[in-house]
């Protein structure tokens, strides 16, 4: 008995959790062929197969174009001179200066340590870029727990082209994308992924100009 024969004839479509096709599209194609019924995937809770699949394809494309992934490594600092990043340093390659024509800051917000704070201020930990945040700690939060919290809007200050600022001056060869940016509450608005994708696409266009 085939899957198609086992289905009631009045089914117009099948809604299926998005769990097929992690490595390639063959699983999806086979499943569609077996049921012979319009098949639509429903996105489950993250991390979803679709999201992981997209991430894998992007990384494969990155590597095929000469990109290098430093697995489990972490950028810990760098040098800015003449309003441009000269190089970055990392935990596992302490003697190497990582140099590029352009740099993209996609470190996220507080949860991923793209932003940090102490008892006095909020700061960007890698290059100490300018951060838009209140200097009064009492203004970081609201008493109402479920309201939008002021600290959720804090982030790295940039110009219109997403170049971050350092001491009020534009860092010309660096861009910031995603939830590290100021003025966007991705937690309350639940649109962090969309903003990350759109700002990344815009920055890619800026670099390719």
Model segments located where?
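Glycine-/small-residue-rich beta->alpha transition segments that form the dinucleotide
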Residues: 92-95, 101-113, 180
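Gly/Ser/Thr-rich active-site loops/lids in small-molecule metabolic enzymes
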Residues: 117-140, 197-202
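Short, small-residue-biased leader/transition segments that mark boundaries at the very start
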Residues: 2-7
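A conserved beta-strand/loop element that lines the FAD pocket in flavoprotein oxidoreductases
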Residues: 65-75
